[in-house]
Amino acid sequence: MTDDKDVLRDVWFGRIPTCFTLYQDEITEREAEPYYLLLPRVSYLTLVTDKVKKHFQKVMRQEDISEIWFEYEGTPLKWHYPIGLLFDLLASSSALPWNITVHFKSFPEKDLLHCPSKDAIEAHFMSCMKEADALKHKSQVINEMQKKDHKQLWMGLQNDRFDQFWAINRKLMEYPAEENGFRYIPFRIYQTTTERPFIQKLFRPVAADGQLHTLGDLLKEVCPSAIDPEDGEKKNQVMIHGIEPMLETPLQWLSEHLSYPDNFLHISIIPQPTD
């Protein structure tokens, strides 16, 4: 991969100032103060909120505590979506800090998966990585790794260790020089305006004539509603990690540098904010 290490670092160390508030109907023994945290964009809510859980459990009776879940403005937050994706999709136009409501009862079974332990997060994360490598390298790279390499990827994410994670992850970002890119680009496109969870299709980074496909090419093919058919300009905000890449950006470069740790490009299509 081309080595723009500063970009990789900026993506990894992206943070969202967040204020956690206990839901008003939760029963407490004394007033629950809000809890503030800088959330890592690349991580998962249930992986980085142990301190939040402990903070609010201190003011609650044990019998009133069941599985923790989070909500933003009435929308339950999916723990298996990366934090940065959740923010971009639901709250990118709101003022900071991001205000998240904490619940300990009435788990929304229809909207959320249960997260009984960090093992569930690890299993989901590794499943995504394996799917991404199946698309990129027919699973050859991830299958040639040892179990300790898989563990190092997970521990790097869990403990927020950039160098530990990228020492292994860089192997997943390589490809034969003669091929100009991966076999297919692992991506998921999310929209708030549809019930469909996300769009995911097979898409090659290089066209048959050898030209590099761009972000604009991807959107025209798999999500044409995001692009104006007349001039090819964006009709919506197209966001990855809180930024709007130019439509001319090669998809291969984006995949190498702006993928989340699960090796997917998580792309949010958001209506343009109205003044």
Curated annotation (Swiss-Prot):
Pfam families on file? ATG5_HBR (PF20637), ATG5_UblA (PF20638), ATG5_UblB (PF04106)
Briefly state the modifications made to the protein after translation: Conjugated to ATG12; which is essential for autophagy, but is not required for association with isolation membrane.
Kindly state the tissue distribution recorded for this protein.
Answer: Ubiquitous. The mRNA is present at similar levels in viable and apoptotic cells, whereas the protein is dramatically highly expressed in apoptotic cells.
What's the main place this protein lives? Answer: cytoplasm
Induction statement: By apoptotic stimuli.
- Which keywords label this protein? Acetylation, Apoptosis, Autophagy, Cytoplasm, Disease variant, Host-virus interaction, Immunity, Isopeptide bond, Membrane, Neurodegeneration, Ubl conjugation
**Localization of this protein:** Cytoplasm; Preautophagosomal structure membrane
* Protein name per its UniProtKB record: Autophagy protein 5
The record's GO CC annotations read: Atg12-Atg5-Atg16 complex; autophagosome; axon; axoneme; cytoplasm; cytosol; glutamatergic synapse; membrane
User: Which organism encodes this protein?
Assistant: Homo sapiens (Human)
